[in-house]
UniProtKB/Swiss-Prot annotation:
UniProt KW Cytoplasm keyword: yes
Function field: Involved in unsaturated fatty acids biosynthesis. Catalyzes the dehydration of short chain beta-hydroxyacyl-ACPs and long chain saturated and unsaturated beta-hydroxyacyl-ACPs.
GO biological process: fatty acid biosynthetic process; lipid A biosynthetic process
Taxonomic path: Bacteria, Pseudomonadati, Pseudomonadota, Gammaproteobacteria, Legionellales
GO cellular component, as recorded: cytoplasm; membrane
Family: Belongs to the thioester dehydratase family. FabZ subfamily.
Broadest EC class assigned to this enzyme: lyase
Protein name: 3-hydroxyacyl-[acyl-carrier-protein] dehydratase FabZ
Record field: transmembrane: none
Cell location: Cytoplasm
Keyword check for Transmembrane: no
Highest taxon listed in the record's lineage: Bacteria
HAMAP family documented for this protein: FabZ
Keyword field: Cytoplasm, Lipid A biosynthesis, Lipid biosynthesis, Lipid metabolism, Lyase
Amino acid sequence: MNESIDINQIFTLLPHRYPFILVDRVIDYKVMEYLIAIKNVTINENFFTGHFPGNPIMPGVLMLEALAQACGILANLSRQPKEGYEFLHYFAGIDNARFKQVVIPGDQLRLEVRLAGQKRDFWRMHGEAYIGDKLACSADLLSAAKEIKK
């Protein structure tokens, strides 16, 4: 088990910022293998204003985005760019996306991603999001990394 990664460290690993950062903390990871992170879902999320008034539910595509961000963190922890550069991961594909449980304010989404394969700049991962012990969402995700100047 590695030490946890807080939001300030996450900001060094992902380009996302409010209101689109969907990972609050990494609680465990092993480079080139897996990462476990959390997203605390609160009523203050801007998407709850319209999805849905009086019945707030986290959109499924944002659960997938949270998984994709967790994948980006794992990939960036697993590979070092050239001096003065950083990797930006583009969402390149998704397969087998399934939604099993609604996510509402007050839930803590546990994001578990596992590296399924990596070839050159392409990263394939499997992700699962849980509320407690209930599977909320799962998918196979593909990203393409591009090395860009800082």
